[in-house]
Structure formats: C-alpha cells, structure tokens
Amino acid sequence: MNKYRTHTCSELTIDSRGKDVVLSGWINKKRDHGNLLFIDLRDNYGMTQCIIDKSNQNFNSLEKIQLESVIKINGKVVERTKETINTDLQTGEIEVNINSFEVLGTCKELPMPVFSDQEYAEEIRLKYRFLDLRRKKIHDNIILRSKVISFIRSEMSKLGFLEFQTPILTSSSPEGARDFLVPSRLNPGKFYALPQAPQQFKQLIMVSGFDKYFQIAPCFRDEDARADRSPGEFYQLDLEMSFVEQEDVFQVVEKLIVNVFKKFSEKKLMYEKFPRIPYEESMLKYGSDKPDLRNPLIISDLSNIFIRDDVTFEIFKKLVKSGSKVRCIVTKNTKDKPRSFFDNIDKWAKEQGASGLAYFTIEKEENISARGPVGKFFSKEALEEIMKITGAEIGDSIFFACGKINDVEKITSLARDKIAKDLKLIDENTFAFCWVVDYPMFEKNEVTNKIEFSHNPFSMPQGDLKDIDFDNPLNIKAYQYDIVCNGIELSSGAIRNHVPELMYKLFSIAGYQKEQVDEKFSGMINALSYGAPPHGGIAPGIDRIVMLLANEKNIREVTMFPMNQNAQDLMMNAPSNVNEEQLKELGLALKLKK
C-alpha cells in the first residue's frame, strides 16, 4: 500500500462509506464550528471534506495548523446527511472522520490566499507562482495545456508526422525580433543565438529526405510583452511537409485544429472548412489581417463618393484629393439609437488618437435623406450610391473615417470591434477560424523608403518563376498564410522557397548582397543546392491555442512560469548579475549605459 494515500481527494464516493482510508494533500480551508472542525483537503485531483471532533486528542493540534500546510490523515468514510450534500464536489456525498493526522509540510504565513477567487497584483502572483498555480482556475489551465499537447502529439502521429528535436543553440539570423545571444567560451568573441523559431532546421529536415516533421518547439524572442504574447519564450506546434502546396498544408492543419477544439471546448465552430481571405480583402473589409469573423460588421471604401460634385463635405473632399482614403462601417437598424450612442463612439475614436468618426442615419420620408451632423452634405443620389456600395438600407447608420491608409485601417478596425461589442453582436460561444492568404512578398518602409520583406524571407513567390515581375516587387504575392481565430493570430506559415537562385534574387530586392546571404544562411543555401523538395509548413502557437480553449484573455494565465512584462522572472530572480570570473572566462566585459 502507498505510504501516503489509499485514494486521491477526488475518488471517494457513497460506495466508499465505511472504508478506512489514508488521504494526503493541502489544507485548502478550515471551518471551526466549536465542537467540530471541518478541513477541506485538496490535491491535484480534487477535494474531500474531512472532520474531526473536539473529543479527539488531535483536535487542538489540527486546529492550529496553517492553511496550505500538507498533511496526511487517517480516517473512516461516512455518508453525509442529506442536507449537507455538496453537489459541487465530486466527493460531495461523503466526508472522512479523522482519526489521526501527520504534518508532511508546514506552510508559512501566506502572501495571498489560495482558495480565494480574488484577483491579486501580478507582481505578487508571479513572485509566488507556486502558490498561484495551486488556485483552481490556473491549476486547471495548466492541466488543460498538458492534455492539449498530449492530444496534439497523438493526432500528429496519426497523420504520419515524426517528432524531431532541433538545436537550441544556433546562429543569429534576422527573423523579425531581437535574438537572445549566448557567448561561446570555446570560441571567444563569438555568440550562439537561441532560436526565434526552428525555421531553417525544419527546412533542412525536409532537404534531408524526411517527409513530415513536427515538434512542440520552444522559441525565444527578445520582444516586448502583450496580453497574447509572452516575453522571452513561447511554444509552438512546429510542422513541415515535403511535396505539398498551400492547400495540402491547410487540409492537415484544419483537421488537427477542428479535432483539438471539438475535444477540449463546448463552444461552436463557425466553420470546419476555414474561409480563405486574401490579405488585401481582409485589410479592406476588416481593417486588419487578424479578422474576428464572429463580428458581422464589414468595412467599405467610400473614397470615390467624395469626388462627386453633389457631396459637399469639404473636409473629407480635400483629404481625398490629397490621397487620403475614406472607409465606413454600416450598423443595421440603428435609427432609434439615442444621440449619445453615436456621440460616445465619436468621442471614443478621438481618445484613440483619431480625429473622430463622422456619422449619419439613412431615412426616407418622401425622399432618401441622411440624419446626423454630416447628413446635409450628401445628395439623394449620393446616398443611393453609398447604399449600393455598402448594402446599407433605410434605418441603418454609417460611421466614416478619413485619413492615410494605415491610419484609417487602424481606426476602422478598432471601431468595428468597439461598435460590435456595444451592440452585443459577437457570439462569445463561437470559434471563427479563417486563413488570411496572398500576402505581399515585399513592403516599403515608410521611414527609410526601402523595400523590405513583409513577412518570411524564405517564402515562395506566387506564379511561374518566368512570369514574376521583379521590376515591380510590391506587386509580388507570396505563398504566405496566417491562421486566425476570433481576431487572434495563431500562426504564420508558408510554402518555402527551395530554389537558391530565386532566393538570392529576392534577397537582392530587399537590399542584401550575395555575400550577406551566404554569411547569414550558409547552411540553408548550401543544403538547397543538393536537391531540395518543394515543401511548406506552419507553426500554430500552443500558448494561444490553450488561451482560447481556456477562455483567457492573457497568455500568462496558461503559462506555468511566465515572466512579467519587463521580461523578469520574479520567482527565480532572473535575469541576474553574474560574477567577474564568469565574464572573464567568456572574454566579456560589461559596459552599461548610464
């Protein structure tokens, strides 16, 4: 028999009554009723109510023990009276009469209670993360994470993928974020980098003749924290396949994602075959390449309306003439909304840094007209054209934004979310997945005016190689794709460029000399020169998948030991100083900014 327990704290049922049992766990809660002391004993699996009578010689000792101390109890299972049954507990029909107990681990005074649902400052929670992880909600999140990863591994194996581990110490490469650098003791003055992603290695695996690869890969990026992004490190389901096109990758990932979300969530899937939305369409209709398709509001372009002579809204007309764009959002049947509804949205837009949102409501008495601060500037014919473009009807309202394309996309995207939430249009019980496809290969840096890769430099451009318009690189589309759920990007992926000559050409457009490419990507370029198959892949974020399944808004709620927003581990006191001897051994000296 196990020394510490005969059962876990979730196992005992009405069928266990009369049994002598041994339980071990943490004291979750104590309730002293004078002659009776109630102990809620908790372990990883659940909770059992234990009781001790004042006549028991151990009563006074047990009464003094601090919450969250670990104890072992010996006792007998008894049936609860009908009125004391707790239907919220798996063990709620029984309790254990304590005969004796043993303290296995004492607990100091708690900096935060474990049994409480009260929210505490992040600093306290992260410093005492081992206590925070005992709280039921986050404890369940971490268990969910483990189960999701285990299920993913099983599904990937069924799909014919093999799991391989790629190096953690590798070379630095410009993949978008700053690298974490590791000095080499044996090669003074040189550095390893922790991988931002196993990008080059997984392609090399394909070149090595393996057909389908995956791993639950740790990735390291020296970037700022966000609610949906941990600083420092994160994990992704990294996968790559040989002899595939874009749709082949989509079919595998869709099957996996649908199975995962059906197994671990009761929420509905809006689509089991995810819509494919071209990047340009996504930026127009949703103002973002991370659209939330639960939101029915659609953005339309009305720039040409402000060229018309029968539209006299001069502020917008002048801006459009100088190159600005006008985008609008239609809200259905909002004619009876109070003026405060519209003014509050306009005020909110100004708080976001925009100049506001113009608006009017379409009405019809004898003729079509527009009610609102700017309605008088539009003729009947102009309103009819707006209705034709946007699908607006009598009784609908229209919000307008005007400005530079990037600014107007940003504010209309935010406004789309804001208005939908105010009107309660979003079904929170739904997952809406989609693919955003046809990303541009290149973009122009507005500050330097130089051509840069817009996403992954290793992507294959679309079209026959002989027909690619290298003279107009901003027109080149790539086989790059993102998978998005409820406005959250889960992953980027691509069909890879496996042709060295083409890779040199594309890097030259982005300003790289051949020598620079050879220096940065020598292993990759060399391998591709020895017979590389067409291949592609993707890497959905494990943290974000679990965040969605757990219905959490912050990724730190599904990460076991996260850092804070300053990339500090408050529990382990990292990063920390190192001694002079360590630095000397590495050939390093510190030169700190004053």
Curated annotation (Swiss-Prot):
Keywords: Aminoacyl-tRNA synthetase, ATP-binding, Cytoplasm, Ligase, Nucleotide-binding, Protein biosynthesis
Leader sequence residues: none
Entry EC number(s): 6.1.1.23
Main subcellular location: cytoplasm
Enzyme superclass (EC): ligase
GO cellular component: cytoplasm
Disulphide bridges: none
Ranges for region Aspartate: 199-202
Domain of life: Bacteria
Residue numbers marked as site, Important for tRNA non-discrimination: H33
A Gene Ontology BP annotation from the UniProt entry: aspartyl-tRNA aminoacylation
GO MF entries: aspartate-tRNA ligase activity; aspartate-tRNA(Asn) ligase activity; ATP binding; nucleic acid binding
InterPro entries, alphabetized: Aa-tRNA-synt_II, aa-tRNA-synth_II, aa-tRNA-synth_II/BPL/LPL, Asp-tRNA-ligase_1, Asp-tRNA-ligase_1_N, Asp/Asn-tRNA-synth_IIb, AspRS_core, GAD-like_sf
Catalytic activity: tRNA(Asx) + L-aspartate + ATP = L-aspartyl-tRNA(Asx) + AMP + diphosphate
Compartments where located: Cytoplasm
Residues holding L-aspartate: E175, R221, H455, R496
Annotated binding of ATP, by residue: R221, D222, E223, E489, G541, I542, D543, R544
Self-association and partners: Homodimer.
Role description: Aspartyl-tRNA synthetase with relaxed tRNA specificity since it is able to aspartylate not only its cognate tRNA(Asp) but also tRNA(Asn). Reaction proceeds in two steps: L-aspartate is first activated by ATP to form Asp-AMP and then transferred to the acceptor end of tRNA(Asp/Asn).
Family as reported in the entry's similarity comment: Belongs to the class-II aminoacyl-tRNA synthetase family. Type 1 subfamily.
Protein name per its UniProtKB record: Aspartate--tRNA(Asp/Asn) ligase
Record gene name: aspS
